[in-house]
């Protein structure tokens, strides 16, 4: 290969780093070809390995040198952060600006530290192993070195937002616990990204291969004269023309031919072209404009990039393009992992003053006033500005500030060395998203709006909210926040001085029900109750504290019943509560067993605490002992007794003895031992034949064994087999009778006498076991228990039942009484808020045991100030039904500022709001932010206040003159932020573009080129007025809150974005076609629309990759985008047989339309269609390829119904069928086959023309063929 451009190399004694090595290999490859380059690479490898082995480089802890300047730099940075905090506290910047400024301060500190690390290594320790390793390209990078010996820096949280607490330590010094926790965010994110996104990248590659696999270089020249201008290329870089062919000749300024069409653009060509002063525009051939059918030609594709010469015929360039775009996705995934999730804010480049001096520039430049992200005011430049700095020695420095930059200085302003004078935005197409940040009040106080323009707006649901349309301040005038009791009456007005016992408010207390007053005094305050109703048991006495519990004795005519109380006196009762349980062992068993019963009240047998009447019936108890064991060793001694009869008192397990004796069984599966009392009878074989073997009861006098054994008592028969013999166990049954006891009744005395319907005490009996339930117990159980329960039907709200003991005439005995009380809520026992800490007392207007009618004023709650202070405000927006809010000024909320002769030189008045640094008189600045409360002869009294700066567009939650607590939301700042360009945005963004997905919140696009203006109607609604080149006026509605991307009067191109938001490619295509179809034919309009959309998509995809530091040749992206924009959809079939909605290839459609026109028929009308890579694959001409990708059944079914043919033109369908693929060597083979077929076809055609006169029908023709 002849070299096109040789760089003259001479001996250089320099350090070769990664970049130099890359440049060396690039030059070798460019000038000497693949073979020689590989030899050079091999020799370089051997050389470096040899010396690396000899040097024995090893990394130790001592090699990690932390720069000495680090401590000083961290100190300076902290001071700068503190200054920013002070600016925020005086209301000069918003919380968002403070956050952004803090992040930028730490980011700049990090970058300075990184430079220090590099300077130290380069100048003081160039042979440091860490430095050699990172900068030779062996392992690691500058970011990792910075984290090792500089500082770890700022981290992002899982939501992608930056944490404003930087990690100041490095890995050499070690992280603190807090830093370690924050640090782990990024590390985890990197690991998760690596795992998840690799799968996404692989799937993206598969889809790309599927859409482009049939693009093969099939011919040398398609013969097109079309191409792309150099300015239209996505990279827009002069060097990226290399490897393409000229579509049009280039002429010099004099009109001489410099290069003819189809000239290859090489390095030499470009170097020579640079020497020309002026030349005609460069137009190059591109895959986008190639007219080859289902392929691309050599001249339009250009060089094969791996060996810098024209691509060969048969090259599968589609596969190469798909892999070139898909493979970097895997690299992008790892991007976060390499930097450990560390944030790097390289979005703007700061221009600093190179020296001290005065700034000069022409003031007539177009610019708009702009507030930076840090809260500084500056100018957004619309055009380039020439900046000049002059110092006192006459030295002048001038430099250019490009358009769209931020200028932060005025003309004639004096600047210092290293002062930031401008910010240049690196990428004008950054991803902006709207964010919200809530502002919380740091103190309690009164809200005051200063210079805000409040407007009420409504959302789509009709909910109203307040917004601020102008930057201003929200002041919180400090004070202590208190809540007064509900329905309280405020006695004072704001501004009054308060003493310790000044009465602030009073709350009247009324009773709802009549009754007797009961006043309880405790540590929690005074409680007032009104007894409305009571019931007393007159035939029941309480013996207090008998055997550590209270006993209830109920006397009837026949006997006394003893109950044990289960409820403590003075306790509050609920419906169904148990008051007492009867001491009765009548229904108690000695062991466990099986219970069954026959009762007249079956509902009472259910296990629930319901109030039921007394019932009668019988319990049948079959006793049985059950013992649980954990290991077989515990029952090993009893194995010999298994399945035999044991006696009473016999030892079953260690220290465990049988109480009843009986049939002994060991059940290993259940880990239990059972002893069933009863007699065991063996059955003969004859008896077992006629015996009813079901378990059952046998009444006294009946046979147990027919004709043999009669029982004298009720028994329960159980049948079982033992050692192949059959036995009956007759188990004794205990019968417990439940008589209907009518003598146990409660004599109840009610007061008032007419109100006894809704409260009662009832005697009920409860069974707690289900019928036929087996109960495991060694100590016995109560089958039936008698209870006294509380029955309460609450018809009147607000009454509380309580159990009480009423003294009787007999000493040591009391009556049982239940009383209903209305509890009057006082403020002491109703305190729900932590802010209600003002002293309160309850004043009673009634005495104990006094009878009161309903709605009587029985007392009031009084709230006092508690300290010597001042009442500042009462919340005016609360009605009397809610808790009232007051603000009280304590001495700590007021500050004195001494000012001599203040009246003579004062610059402030009472009521003024001042910030820190405001002049109070000619000599004294205010050390506090606040409100001037009073001015005295020698001092000023300031009420401390906190100002919050609010930007335009902020949503307001607080109202002026309202009171707020510390932590209440005041407002929500709405601002724009730049998304961190991490892979989480990168790879999905590429996928979104390639899949041509619909975009939410898309930008408004210009329907035609023209001059754009923003107009407002009388309702305040904004519209965009577009005056086209033909003076046609179009009006476009703007949604509320949407920002425009142009200034009124700017010229906008067709389909350019007029508002903020993402551009939807589908909307862009529709806009372009609707504009062009009125000016050109359908074919031309479609072609133009596709071309502009293709350039847009290529630009967007390339921008996303380049923002991640990945470089892909434009020609690869062009091939994929061409596949996405090659289909049209038929709208009207004309006189053809096509159906509306049918999707066809654009070139095929153009040919059909041309034929229809030539024949005088109406051609079909169609619109351009943008397909994502998945849909483009499924709409492939080859149904075999489409079916092997996705939706196999649907694709094959449709192909069968339509009777489609697959011409096997691509690689995939040939692989599936098993044929030779038409690429590489297979391409030449198939070319030869086609050539032979063509030649044979020509011979056959000649023969047919001669054979035709012999016969007119096909049969004769076949006969002639056979001959």
Swiss-Prot record:
Known cofactor(s): Zn(2+)
Key word Lipid metabolism present: no
Protein localization: Plastid, Chloroplast
Keywords: Chloroplast, DNA-directed RNA polymerase, Metal-binding, Nucleotidyltransferase, Plastid, Transcription, Transferase, Zinc
One Pfam family of this chain: RNA_pol_Rpb1_4
GO cellular component: chloroplast; DNA-directed RNA polymerase complex; mitochondrion
Keyword RNA-binding (UniProt): no
Cofactor: how bound: Binds 1 Zn(2+) ion per subunit.
Catalyzed reactions per annotation: RNA(n) + a ribonucleoside 5'-triphosphate = RNA(n+1) + diphosphate
InterPro entries assigned to the protein according to its UniProt record, in alphabetical order: DNA-dir_RpoC2_beta_pp (IPR012756), DNA-dir_RpoC_beta_prime (IPR045867), RNA_pol_Rpb1_3_sf (IPR042102), RNA_pol_Rpb1_4 (IPR007083), RNA_pol_Rpb1_5 (IPR007081), Rpb1_funnel_sf (IPR038120)
Catalytic activity, EC: 2.7.7.6
Main location group: plastid
Source domain of life: Eukaryota
One Gene Ontology molecular-function label: DNA binding
Single GO BP term: DNA-templated transcription
Annotated positions binding Zn(2+): 222, 290, 297, 300
EC supergroup of this enzyme: transferase
Signal peptide: none
NCBIfam families hit by this protein: rpoC2_cyan (TIGR02388)
Assembly notes: In plastids the minimal PEP RNA polymerase catalytic core is composed of four subunits: alpha, beta, beta', and beta''. When a (nuclear-encoded) sigma factor is associated with the core the holoenzyme is formed, which can initiate transcription.
Role of this protein: DNA-dependent RNA polymerase catalyzes the transcription of DNA into RNA using the four ribonucleoside triphosphates as substrates.
Family label: Belongs to the RNA polymerase beta' chain family. RpoC2 subfamily.
Protein name: DNA-directed RNA polymerase subunit beta''
Organism: Emiliania huxleyi
Phylogenetic placement of the source organism: Eukaryota, Haptista, Haptophyta, Prymnesiophyceae, Isochrysidales
């Amino acid at each position: 290969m002849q070299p096109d451009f040789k760089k003259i190399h001479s001996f250089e004694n320099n350090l070769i780093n990664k970049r130099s090595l890359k440049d060396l290999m690039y030059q070798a490859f460019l000038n000497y070809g693949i073979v020689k380059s590989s030899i050079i690479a091999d020799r370089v490898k051997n050389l470096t390995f040899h010396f690396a082995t000899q040097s024995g480089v090893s990394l130790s802890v001592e090699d990690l040198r932390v720069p000495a300047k680090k401590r000083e730099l961290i100190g300076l940075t902290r001071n700068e952060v503190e200054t920013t905090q002070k600016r925020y506290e005086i209301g000069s910047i918003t919380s968002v600006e403070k956050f952004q400024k803090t992040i930028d301060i730490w980011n700049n500190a990090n970058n300075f530290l990184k430079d220090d690390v590099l300077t130290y290594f380069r100048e003081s320790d160039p042979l440091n192993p860490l430095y050699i390793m990172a900068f030779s390209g062996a392992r690691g990078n500058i970011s990792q070195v910075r984290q090792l010996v500089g500082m770890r820096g700022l981290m992002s949280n899982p939501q992608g937002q930056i944490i404003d607490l930087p990690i100041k330590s490095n890995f050499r010094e070690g992280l603190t616990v807090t830093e370690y926790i924050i640090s782990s965010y990024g590390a985890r994110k990197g690991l998760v990204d690596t795992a998840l996104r690799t799968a996404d990248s692989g799937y993206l590659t598969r889809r790309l291969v599927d859409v482009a696999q049939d693009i093969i270089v099939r011919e040398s020249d398609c013969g097109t004269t079309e191409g792309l201008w150099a300015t239209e290329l996505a990279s827009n870089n002069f060097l990226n023309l290399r490897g393409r062919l000229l579509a049009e000749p280039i002429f010099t300024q004099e009109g001489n031919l410099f290069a003819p069409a189809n000239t290859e653009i090489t390095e030499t060509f470009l170097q020579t072209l640079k020497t020309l002063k002026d030349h005609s525009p460069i137009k190059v051939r591109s895959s986008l404009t190639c007219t080859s059918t289902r392929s691309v030609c050599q001249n339009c594709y250009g060089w094969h990039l791996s060996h810098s010469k024209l691509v060969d015929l048969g090259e599968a360039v589609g596969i190469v393009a798909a892999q070139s775009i898909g493979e970097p996705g895997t690299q992008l995934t790892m991007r976060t992992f390499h930097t450990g999730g560390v944030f790097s804010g390289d979005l703007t480049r700061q221009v600093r003053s190179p020296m001290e001096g005065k700034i000069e520039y022409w003031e007539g430049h177009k610019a708009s006033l702009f507030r930076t992200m840090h809260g500084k005011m500056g100018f957004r430049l619309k055009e380039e500005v020439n900046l000049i700095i002059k110092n006192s020695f006459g030295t002048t420095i001038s430099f250019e500030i490009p358009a769209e930059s931020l200028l932060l200085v005025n003309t004639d302003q004096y600047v210092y060395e290293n002062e930031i004078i401008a910010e240049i935005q690196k990428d004008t197409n950054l991803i902006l998203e709207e964010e919200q940040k809530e502002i919380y009040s740091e103190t309690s106080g009164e809200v005051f709006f200063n210079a805000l323009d409040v407007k009420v707006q409504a959302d789509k649901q009709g909910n109203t909210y307040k917004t601020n349309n102008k930057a201003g301040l929200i002041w919180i005038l400090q004070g202590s926040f208190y809540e007064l009791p509900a329905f309280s009456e405020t006695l004072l007005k704001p501004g009054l001085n308060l003493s310790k016992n000044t009465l602030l408010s009073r709350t009247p207390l009324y009773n709802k029900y009549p009754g007797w007053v009961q006043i309880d005094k405790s540590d929690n305050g005074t409680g007032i109750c009104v007894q409305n109703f009571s019931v007393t048991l007159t035939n029941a006495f309480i013996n207090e504290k008998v055997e550590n519990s209270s006993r209830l004795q109920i006397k009837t005519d026949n006997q006394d019943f003893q109950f044990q109380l289960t409820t403590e006196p003075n306790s509050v009762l609920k419906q169904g509560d148990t008051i007492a349980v009867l001491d009765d062992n009548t229904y108690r068993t000695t062991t466990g067993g099986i219970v069954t019963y026959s009762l007249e009240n079956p509902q009472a047998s259910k296990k629930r605490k319901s109030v039921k009447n007394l019932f009668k019936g019988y319990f049948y108890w079959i006793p049985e002992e059950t013992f649980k064991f954990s290991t077989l060793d515990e029952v090993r001694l009893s194995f010999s007794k298994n399945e035999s009869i044991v006696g009473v008192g016999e030892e079953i397990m260690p220290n465990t003895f049988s109480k009843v004796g009986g049939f002994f069984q060991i059940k290993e599966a259940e880990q239990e031992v059972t002893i069933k009392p009863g007699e065991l009878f063996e059955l003969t074989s004859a008896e077992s034949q006629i015996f009813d073997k079901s378990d059952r009861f046998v009444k006294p006098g009946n046979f147990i064994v027919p004709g043999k054994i009669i029982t004298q008592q009720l028994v329960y028969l159980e049948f079982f087999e033992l050692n192949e013999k059959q036995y009956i166990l007759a188990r004794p049954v205990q019968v417990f009778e439940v008589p209907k006891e009518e003598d146990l009744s409660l004599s109840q005395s009610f007061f008032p006498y007419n109100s006894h319907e809704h409260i009662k005490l009832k005697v009920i009996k409860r069974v707690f076991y289900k019928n036929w339930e087996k109960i495991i117990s060694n100590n016995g159980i109560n089958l039936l228990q008698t209870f006294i329960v509380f029955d309460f039907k609450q018809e009147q709200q607000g009454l509380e039942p309580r159990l009480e003991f009423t003294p009787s005439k007999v000493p040591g005995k009391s009556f049982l009484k239940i009383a209903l009380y209305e509890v009057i809520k006082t403020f002491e026992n109703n305190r729900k808020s932590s802010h209600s800490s003002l002293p309160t007392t309850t004043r009673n207007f009634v005495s104990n045991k006094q009878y009161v009618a309903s709605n009587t004023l029985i007392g009031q709650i009084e709230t006092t100030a508690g300290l010597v202070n001042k009442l500042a405000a009462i919340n005016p927006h609360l009605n009397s039904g809610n808790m009232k809010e007051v603000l009280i000024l304590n001495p700590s909320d007021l500050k004195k500022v001494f000012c001599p002769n203040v009246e003579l030189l004062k610059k402030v008045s009472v009521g003024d709001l001042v910030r820190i640094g405001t002049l109070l008189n000619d000599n004294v600045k205010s050390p506090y932010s606040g409100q001037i409360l009073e001015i005295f002869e020698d001092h000023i009294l300031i009420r401390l206040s906190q100002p919050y700066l609010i930007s335009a567009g902020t949503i307001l939650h607080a109202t002026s003159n309202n009171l707020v607590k510390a932590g209440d939301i005041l407002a929500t700042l709405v601002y724009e932020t730049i998304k961190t360009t991490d892979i989480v945005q990168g790879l999905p963004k590429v996928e979104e573009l390639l899949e041509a997905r619909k975009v939410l919140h898309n930008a408004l696009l210009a329907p035609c080129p023209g001059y754009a203006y923003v107009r407002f109607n009388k309702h305040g609604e904004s519209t965009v007025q577009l005056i086209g080149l033909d003076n046609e006026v179009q009006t476009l509605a703007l949604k509320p809150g949407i920002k425009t991307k142009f200034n009124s009067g700017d010229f906008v191109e067709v389909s350019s974005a007029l508002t903020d938001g993402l551009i939807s490619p589908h909307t862009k295509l529709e806009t372009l076609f609707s504009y062009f179809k009125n000016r050109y034919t359908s074919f031309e309009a479609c072609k133009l629309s596709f071309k502009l959309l293709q350039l847009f998509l290529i630009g967007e995809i390339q921008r996303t990759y380049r923002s991640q530091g990945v470089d892909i040749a434009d020609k690869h992206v062009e091939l994929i985008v061409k596949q996405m924009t090659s289909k049209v959809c038929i709208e009207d079939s004309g006189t053809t047989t096509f159906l509306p909605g049918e999707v066809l290839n654009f070139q095929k459609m153009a040919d059909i339309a041309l034929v229809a026109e030539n024949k005088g028929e109406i051609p079909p009308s169609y619109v351009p269609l943008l397909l994502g890579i998945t849909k483009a694959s499924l709409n492939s001409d080859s149904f075999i390829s489409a079916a092997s990708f996705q939706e196999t059944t649907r694709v094959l079914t449709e192909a069968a119904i339509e009777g489609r043919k697959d011409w096997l033109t691509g690689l995939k369908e040939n692989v599936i069928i098993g044929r030779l693929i038409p690429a590489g060597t297979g391409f030449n083979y198939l070319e030869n086959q086609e050539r032979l077929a063509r030649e044979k076809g020509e011979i056959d055609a000649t023969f047919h023309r001669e054979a035709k006169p012999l016969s007119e029908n096909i049969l004769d023709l076949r006969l002639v063929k056979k001959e």
